[in-house]
Amino acid sequence: MSSARFDSSDRSAWYMGPVTRQEAQTRLQGQRHGMFLVRDSSTCPGDYVLSVSENSRVSHYIINSLPNRRFKIGDQEFDHLPALLEFYKIHYLDTTTLIEPAPRYPSPPVGSVSAPNLPTAEENLEYVRTLYDFPGNDAEDLPFKKGELLVIIEKPEEQWWSARNKDGRVGMIPVPYVEKLVRSSPHGKHGNRNSNSYGIPEPAHAYAQPQTTTPLPTVASTPGAAINPLPSTQNGPVFAKAIQKRVPCAYDKTALALEVGDIVKVTRMNINGQWEGEVNGRKGLFPFTHVKIFDPQNPDDNE
């Protein structure tokens, strides 16, 4: 298993903001397993999406923002996003852990458009193009049709901005329903890195779900792994020696810490590769790749 190569506390390394699902696909498709990014959800404003390259595809996992300011992915809850990423550094989502963030592209994101022929007298104004119809839900909302150009007046909230249409009417618009227009610069400079376009909301059923337990992948899915016959715990205790040190994540109370040379009494061998065992009275889960089974009756196997 590859080790993680990122600092979860460095939000700028992995949070990409309002990146569309299609752009996430483009950035991650064909990349190494475990490359990922965190983006804003266009389906549920305020939520996030963890997009990951795994098993020759790109999976998208919804991260719900809870009222108690915690975050939920699958059946797991976390105090903050760095804690969630730390957890999935050593726990598999489906077939991979999180290894490294996707690199930031210096050029404007795919799908962003240039604002043609905008009045030079309004050089400091920010324009957006509407992605589809919005009828308006409240009196303060600004209804619009798909394809309109709007001028942003102010941004009082993260997901709701004040805008003006061509008729001079002002009202609130939902940010996920529009895309920013990147003004072409005569000096050839790119637009602001945060000028990402929002895509049409993706359906809820398009999201993947992480495994409900904390498994490692099956032996067969581990490249280069040899599939050897394993003893059964039904025939009596099975013992193994730790061949790799393991320091569990502080957020995971189910993991078993291991020191090289520890003798582990294996109590269960799950087919997903996450075994259960006991060391000096401590019980928990550990990856089978960290131990080597031996026969207590044969000292030669202890070498």
Swiss-Prot record:
Q: Which BP terms does GO give this entry?
A: acetylcholine receptor signaling pathway; animal organ morphogenesis; anterior/posterior pattern specification; B cell apoptotic process; blood vessel development; cell chemotaxis; cellular response to interleukin-7; cellular response to transforming growth factor beta stimulus
Q: What does the entry's PTM section describe?
A: Phosphorylated on tyrosine. Phosphorylation is prominent during early development, but decreases at later embryonic stages and in newborn mice.
Region (Disordered) location: 184-203
SUBUNIT field: Interacts with DOCK2 and EPOR. Interacts with phosphorylated CBLB and IRS4. Interacts with INPP5D/SHIP1. Interacts with BCAR1/CAS and NEDD9/HEF1.
What is the top-level taxon of the source organism? Eukaryota
Quote the cellular component terms of the Gene Ontology held in the record. Answer: cytosol; extrinsic component of postsynaptic membrane; neuromuscular junction; nucleoplasm; protein-containing complex; synapse
What's the name of the protein?
Crk-like protein
Q: What is the role of this chain?
A: May mediate the transduction of intracellular signals.
Q: Which CDD domains match?
A: SH2_CRK_like, SH3_CRK_C, SH3_CRK_N
Q: Where is the signal peptide?
A: none
Q: Which residues form the SH2 domain?
A: 14-102
Instruction: State the Gene Ontology terms under molecular function.
Output: identical protein binding; phosphotyrosine residue binding; RNA polymerase II-specific DNA-binding transcription factor binding; signaling adaptor activity
Annotated InterPro entries? CRK_SH3_C, CRK_SH3_N, SH2, SH2_dom_sf, SH3-like_dom_sf, SH3_domain, Tyrosine-phos_adapter
Where on the chain is Phosphotyrosine found, per UniProt? 127, 207
Q: What is the lineage of its organism?
A: Eukaryota, Metazoa, Chordata, Craniata, Vertebrata
Task: Cite the Pfam families for this sequence.
Answer: SH2, SH3_1, SH3_2
Q: Which residues form the SH3 domain?
A: 123-183, 235-296
The record's similarity note reads: Belongs to the CRK family.
Keywords assigned by UniProt, alphabetized: Phosphoprotein, Repeat, SH2 domain, SH3 domain
This protein's record includes keyword Iron: no
